[in-house]
């Protein structure tokens, strides 16, 4: 999981982390699952950016949708 910090003009600092969410039905639900799971342990989530979408395929059938999400949250010292 890659992380980096970003500073804004107000002096606040935000950390960006990368997550992969999965779903059996859609990329949108996969992204939502990633954000929901992150919200259980991270505070002050700010922006989620979908950076990549793919599917797991077996025998010609889609088994799972995956969404890679860059998620920013306020960095607390």
Task: List the model feature ranges, each with a label.
Residues 2-77:
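N-terminal, polar/charged subdomain of small-to-medium soluble alpha/beta proteins
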């Amino acid at each position: 999981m890659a992380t980096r910090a970003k500073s804004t003009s107000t002096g606040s600092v935000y950390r960006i982390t990368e997550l992969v969410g999965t779903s059996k039905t859609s990329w949108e639900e996969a992204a939502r699952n990633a954000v929901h799971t992150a919200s259980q342990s991270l505070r002050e989530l700010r922006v989620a950016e979908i950076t990549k979408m793919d599917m797991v395929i077996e025998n010609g059938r889609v088994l799972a949708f995956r969404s890679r999400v860059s998620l920013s949250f306020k960095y607390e010292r």
